[in-house]
């Protein structure tokens, strides 16, 4: 939208003010909306969705000479409010800033300027952002709309696989925002399909039969590699705190509060369309923040965690089974919605972003930096597995947030794909040595030792109650 039409829109909205004044007393500054997209890749996957910033030059469309046979999706929920914990710490920080007795100077001056805090209502925490709960209706980054748009894009590219179908399943965890995303995605396909939503419980009692196999892994230790990742510098945080404390005498902002300002910036964009708080940071500080997030994710839930690949391997293995059974299975479209951490586990198993050696914490990896967490799992992340046939051969490849990401040593097929039997060997080598049930002591919480829901949903009908987690 150009700026002239935004101004007209603002004027029109001003006339319609009664509908919105209970939410926001002062209107968002429309001239700022859309100007901060360059920094989304630096905001730890908390800012709105964006496409993968690099490509190998290959289109995500199936190559002309090939015919699509099956598609799978692992998706993250859309743009959301902060979690309870982050929401509470941002609210505490806001109260501290609001309590500051002098006028602000420097980067925080905007707080004096009729600023309204973007988290007035804790009941929104953990929720997807929707037209009903956002602060300003001209915000273009609403989770609801992102999910609908994704549904339409999916249908445009893969709808041919649903041609003869009147019904098909969509699998989702029972987190409310994950389910809502799946539902908005499905609703956007129109009413010619009877979609059967399979709501899979996140509870550890589900064992291996879940989209959140992390939760059922009794031995998982997110901080197992703390001795490695905690070596990363925190100087960028002291720099921010010192700068703001110098500009504003007596503010006494701590390093951890400086760290919270990044989340403030990201979530305020989700809710309002932009955030003045983002202007607090220098480009370098954003780079340090982003690398710290990449590197800690690698050790928390990625290939750097002793059980990252094992936990994601359950879902990767099920995905490989679906590919192998593409001829027999009547359903050709396997859509699954879950959280970023679970998609990170799955990507760890798949290996397309595995650098193959530990990520350094002593410095920012420059030459060898394939693991960008926010590029992999921004809000609304979408990891597609495509299976297509070209003459007499079948091929597999991944499309992550619109970019084809080839498997390094298996990309000689059309569109940088990997021939299916070679892909199966590749997958076996990734999963070799992993044993979810014994490594995770899953038997302490569950007797479900394998993932069955893709195969038994019609008999079982999964219908777990939704919750805010
Ligand atoms: C606000 O300032 C008053 C007076 O300085 C202080 O007693 C109170 O604890 C402060 N509240 C917060 C939330 O910082
Ligand atoms: C749809 O049905 C037609 C005619 O029966 C068949 O040729 C085609 O392969 C089917 N398409 C899919 C995606 O199942
Ligand atoms: C939709 O599917 C469900 C379960 O698969 C079935 O019970 C229901 O009758 C179907 N509804 C329509 C209108 O086809
Ligand atoms: C996780 O690993 C860290 C580092 O080895 C260790 O200090 C911590 O006690 C472990 N936590 C659990 C619950 O085992
Ligand atoms: C600044 O905050 C620290 C704790 O965050 C506190 O110990 C210290 O007394 C505070 N200093 C001032 C001047 O308020
Ligand atoms: C992968 O799935 C197959 C079929 O369900 C199962 O036999 C095998 O044990 C699984 N392997 C892993 C590593 O999960
Ligand atoms: C597949 O086609 C190629 C040429 O297009 C041929 O050389 C090859 O023998 C065929 N393979 C099979 C298994 O039919
Ligand atoms: C699995 O690993 C073992 C031991 O490291 C090795 O001997 C075997 O060839 C591997 N199998 C596959 C399929 O990669
Ligand atoms: C789980 O399995 C382990 C070894 O396979 C066994 O030692 C343990 O007793 C089992 N625990 C339960 C609760 O079944
Ligand atoms: C498996 O565990 C569930 C509860 O976690 C229990 O209801 C069920 O009876 C168990 N099944 C078997 C075969 O032990
Ligand atoms: C977040 O807070 C809501 C409302 O208090 C509660 O229902 C939910 O369980 C909480 N979720 C988490 C993960 O703490």
Question: Where are the language model's segments positioned?
Answer:
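Signature for phosphate-centric chemistry
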Residues: 18-169, 173-334, 338-469
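Fungal secretory targeting signals
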Residues: 1-21
């Amino acid at each position: 939208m150009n700026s002239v039409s935004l101004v007209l829109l603002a004027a029109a909205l001003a006339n319609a003010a009664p509908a919105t004044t209970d939410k926001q007393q002062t209107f968002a500054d429309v001239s700022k909306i859309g100007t901060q997209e360059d920094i989304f890749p630096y905001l730890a996957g908390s800012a709105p969705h964006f496409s993968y910033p690099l490509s190998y030059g290959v289109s995500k469309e199936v190559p002309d000479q090939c015919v699509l046979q099956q598609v799978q999706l692992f998706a993250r929920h859309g743009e959301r409010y902060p979690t309870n914990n982050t929401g509470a710490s941002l609210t505490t920080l806001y109260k501290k800033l609001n309590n500051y007795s002098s006028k602000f100077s420097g980067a925080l001056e905007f707080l004096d300027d009729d600023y309204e805090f973007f988290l007035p209502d804790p009941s929104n925490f953990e929720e997807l952002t929707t037209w009903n709960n956002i602060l300003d209706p001209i915000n273009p980054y609403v989770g609801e709309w992102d999910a609908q748009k994704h549904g339409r894009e999916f249908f445009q590219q893969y709808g041919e696989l649903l041609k003869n179908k009147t019904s098909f399943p969509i699998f989702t965890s029972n987190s409310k925002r994950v389910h809502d995303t799946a539902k908005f995605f499905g609703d956007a396909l129109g009413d010619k399909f009877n979609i059967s939503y399979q709501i899979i419980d996140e509870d550890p009692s589900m064992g291996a039969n879940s989209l959140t196999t992390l939760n059922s892994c009794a031995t998982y230790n997110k901080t197992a590699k703390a001795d490695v990742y905690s070596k990363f510098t925190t100087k960028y945080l002291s720099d921010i705190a010192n700068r703001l404390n110098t500009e504003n005498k007596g503010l006494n902002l701590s390093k951890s509060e400086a760290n919270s300002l990044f989340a403030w910036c990201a979530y305020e964009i989700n809710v309002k369309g932009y955030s003045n708080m983002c202007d607090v940071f220098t480009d370098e500080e954003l780079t340090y923040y982003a690398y710290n997030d990449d590197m800690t994710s690698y050790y928390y839930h990625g290939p750097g965690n002793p059980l990252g690949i094992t936990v994601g391997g359950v879902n990767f293995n099920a995905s490989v089974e679906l590919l192998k059974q593409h001829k027999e299975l009547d359903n050709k479209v396997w859509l699954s919605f879950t959280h970023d951490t679970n998609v990170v586990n799955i990507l760890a198993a798949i290996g397309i972003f595995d650098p193959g050696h530990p990520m350094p914490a002593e410095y920012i990896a420059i030459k060898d930096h394939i693991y960008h967490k926010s590029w992999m799992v921004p809000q609304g992340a979408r990891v597609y597995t495509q299976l297509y046939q070209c003459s007499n051969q079948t091929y597999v490849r991944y499309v992550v947030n619109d970019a084809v990401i080839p498997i390094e040593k298996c990309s000689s097929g059309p569109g940088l794909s990997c021939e299916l039997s070679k892909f199966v060997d590749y997958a076996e080598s990734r999963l070799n040595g992993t044993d979810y049930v014994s490594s995770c002591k899953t038997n302490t919480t569950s007797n479900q030792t394998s993932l069955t829901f893709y195969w038994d949903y019609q008999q079982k009908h999964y219908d777990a109650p939704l919750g805010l987690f």
